[in-house]
Amino acid sequence: MSIFKDQFPRIGVSGQSTGYTIDQSIRFNDDDSGRMGRTPSSETNRRTWTFSAWVKRGNLDSSGNKFIFSRAEASKAAYIGFYQDDLTYAAAGGSLEVNLVTDRKFRDPSAWYHIVIAQDTTQAVSRERVRIYVNGVRETSFSSETYPSENYQGYFNTTSLHDIGVSRPSGSISGYFDGYMAEINFLDGYAYDPSYFGEFKENTDIWIPKEYTGSYGTNGFYITGSNSSALGEDFSGNDNDYTTGGLATHDQVLDSPTNNFVVMSSIDFTYDAIRNGNLETIGGNNNKGGRGTFGFSSGKFYWEMLATTVSDGYPGSGVVYDEFDPDMPAAYAGGGTNHGAGASHNQAIWYKQSSSGSTYGSIASSGDILQYAVDRDNNKIYWGVNGTYRNSGDPAGGSGAVASSLTHYGDWMPYVNHGSNAGSSAGTFNFGQDGTFEIGRASCRERV
């Protein structure tokens, strides 16, 4: 379990301080085949519906489809998702009947996107039959743009299986979504714009959520993830619960559109080296490393990493400045002017802005929880293992830092590297959104 200290706040917590709040999200890990599904008992309005959800992407595997919401069978299918990082809504029944693919890419792993797709095929103007919005703004530029015919009867709201986080055409499963979802609304018989679900924060262009208070229709649903033992529970009043697969209680996390946490950046890592909502990184004999999605230039912050597997001294970890090359090994995190500080765990050495370093205690082992307390205001970094700070560190009192007098004036960021010979190394981060470390190995947790 987590050993969070209280003297420093948790890194990355942000969001609105007043108004409507979203308390949690659901983490979908494609390696666990995370998904949920439901088969409606009756066919309802196939012409008119609205889908609304907040989405934060995990790994950025750009191959193929990553499905957010879908309905598929042997010859008829409809889906909302990402295709090579483009937001897409498509439907086909022997031929392609709807196909809207945005020009712009959605590749920011630090961002929550509010996606709204409203269909009303009774509209006389073709482009008004399907409207796509992201963060309150309508998408108008598409690389592919095929609208349904007037009074077209689509494939949502039929009596076939509907899925969240995956698609299952012809009984096979494909295109697992990887990342987080929150506030999943589906309205049966209503085509609403995003103002029903969100609003611009006063005097800004920042889109924030608000409570939906309207009707849902017969097959409508509202999934919040607030019940960790039944993440697909419907809170619309319809009891249209979705059955989950590959999801566990620890996949309810605090990361949300109104409380956005730092994760490790999937832009730095290849898609097969990062997983579990960008909180777990793994080695691949390629000297690959990465930074967190948020940096900080002032304040005091704390986070942890479970060293799931230590191999050849890795994962190395620490704090680096925002322009540091993430592929450089841990020693180089402190190997040049203004770089930051990094630990090589097979030697328990912290390097600080030079190629030399100081040794603090015994080496870190698989199963250890490594602690990082960073006082950016006073340019000090504290490092601990399993609840005890090395160098008799006292972050609250300001003594015993393993690195101090750092001079870089830009943003500092969390950092990890797996080395060139550490193919089995792995580390799981906790920036405050999930202190269970359930996504690490149980045998490791029992050691701390």
Question: Which sequence ranges carry the predicted segments?
Answer:
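Solvent-exposed strand-to-loop "edge" motifs in beta-rich extracellular domains
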Residues: 54-61, 117-122, 294-296, 304-310, ...
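Short tryptophan-centered beta-strand motifs in secreted/extracellular beta-sheet-rich domains
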Residues: 53, 110-121, 132, 303-305, ...
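Short, tryptophan-glycine- and acidic/Ser/Thr-enriched carbohydrate-recognition patches
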Residues: 1-10, 35, 225-281
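Surface-exposed loops/turns
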Residues: 45, 108-109, 297-298, 365-366
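Conserved, ordered domain cores of eukaryotic regulatory proteins
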Residues: 258-344
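Extracellular glycan-associated modules
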Residues: 2-191, 205-232, 388, 398-401
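Aromatic sugar-binding interfaces of carbohydrate-active proteins
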Residues: 139, 156, 160-161, 165, ...
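Glycan-recognition/cleft segments
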Residues: 65-89, 316-350
